[in-house]
Every structure is written in structure tokens, then in C-alpha cells.
């Protein structure tokens, strides 16, 4: 068990060293230069607003789930049915609270639309972390490690094609950048959900 944990920890470190520096110095820096200080500043401010109430999306559910699935893997289906329903309710509450906060700050129109997408991205990111907690609870550490960088890998591919090639004839701007993140999160969430369902069986949403 100790050997498995060490091996998977090394894998996690390796994939992060491989992907994240390229994201920071390759994509993120190029995005800043392409968008300009003004546009990127709008994105950065709204992104921080979407992060501000991020705790409302989880309230410790992910850690609780990871601990319980590690102890009782046979209850995955039961926990999944209940927690997914709770996560949906928390996502709605978080979204409404964040948008209300933005309105009180005077944001409107374009900024609110952009914030709405960023809020959706935070919801997806939180859901991915929850799904990964099921996989790590089932001792599927390698799969969890790969999923931990899948969204960034997809972002690198999508943004790279828009920034450096003509394969995607789409004008790169703050909107397409945020939507490319949404697409990356959606694909990652779908893949993670498929693997979780393989181990849980049929799921019926509940709020017990």
C-alpha cells in the first residue's frame, strides 16, 4: 500500500511539473500579452469575484466524501446520489449570491455575462474535485492524478490552436478564452463522471 501511494504521488508530481509550467509560461503569459492589460484586468477582477464565495460550493463535502468512500467503497452509489443533489443546490445558491454581489458593486451587461460563465466554471471545477474524491477514495490514484491535469491539458490544446495555428478560425478574445476553459471543464467532468459511474452503477439524485 505504501509503495502504491509513493508511486502515485510521484506520478502526480511528474504530470504537474510537465503540464503546469507550460500553462503558466506558455499559455497564460501569451493570453495576457494578446488580450492586453485592460481586457485581462477585467477577466482577472471578475475571476477573483467568482472565487470569493467558492466555499459555498462545497462546505467540506469533498473531504467528507473522500474519507467515507475510502472506508466504505460499497456505498459509493448511495453517497453519489445524495451528494450530487446537494452540490446542485449549493451551485444555484453560490451562483445567485455571487451575481447579487456583483450587481451591488455596479457591474452590468458584458461583465455580468462574463461573470456568469466564470461562475459556471467554478461550479464545474468544484464538481470535478468532488468526482476525483470518489476515485481517490476507491484507491484509483493514477486515474485521479491524470484527471488533475486534464482540464489544463485541454486548455493548452484549445488555446494553443487559437493562438498559434489557424486550425480554429476563431478570434481570440476574453470571451473565447473563458469559454475554452468551460469546454475543458465540461469534457473533464464528463470523463470523470463516466469513470465514477463505472464503479457506482445507476444513480438517482436525492436530497436525503
Label for each model-derived stretch:
Residues 1-23, 77, 81:
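N-terminal membrane topogenesis motif
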Residues 21-26, 44-68, 122-128:
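Small-residue-rich midsections of specific transmembrane alpha-helices
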Residues 27-52, 112, 174-179:
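Interfacial/gating helices of multi-pass transporter permease domains
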Residues 52, 88, 92-96, 100, ...:
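Alpha-helical transmembrane segments of multi-pass membrane proteins
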Residues 112, 116-119, 146-162, 169-199:
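Hydrophobic alpha-helical transmembrane segments
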Residues 125-148:
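Cytoplasmic helix-loop-helix junction between adjacent transmembrane helices
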Amino acid at each position: 500500500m505504501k509503495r502504491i501511494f509513493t508511486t502515485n504521488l510521484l506520478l502526480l508530481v511528474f504530470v504537474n511539473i510537465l503540464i503546469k509550467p507550460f500553462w503558466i509560461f506558455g499559455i497564460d503569459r501569451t493570453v495576457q500579452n494578446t488580450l492586453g492589460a485592460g481586457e485581462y484586468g477585467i477577466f482577472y477582477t471578475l475571476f477573483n469575484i467568482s472565487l470569493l464565495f467558492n466555499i459555498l460550493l462545497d462546505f467540506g463535502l469533498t473531504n467528507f466524501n473522500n474519507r467515507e468512500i475510502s472506508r466504505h467503497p460499497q456505498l459509493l452509489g448511495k453517497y453519489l446520489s445524495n451528494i450530487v443533489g446537494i452540490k446542485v443546490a449549493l451551485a444555484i445558491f453560490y451562483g445567485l449570491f455571487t451575481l447579487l454581489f456583483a450587481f451591488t458593486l455596479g457591474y452590468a451587461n458584458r461583465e455580468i455575462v462574463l461573470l456568469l460563465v466564470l461562475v459556471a466554471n467554478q461550479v464545474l471545477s468544484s464538481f470535478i474535485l468532488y468526482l476525483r474524491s470518489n476515485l481517490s477514495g476507491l484507491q484509483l490514484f493514477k486515474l485521479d492524478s491524470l484527471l488533475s491535469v486534464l482540464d489544463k491539458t485541454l486548455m493548452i490544446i484549445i488555446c494553443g490552436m487559437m493562438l498559434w495555428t489557424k486550425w480554429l478560425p476563431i478570434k481570440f478574445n476574453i470571451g473565447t478564452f473563458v469559454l475554452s476553459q468551460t469546454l475543458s471543464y465540461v469534457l473533464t467532468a464528463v470523463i470523470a463522471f463516466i469513470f465514477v459511474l463505472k464503479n457506482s452503477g445507476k444513480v438517482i439524485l436525492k436530497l436525503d
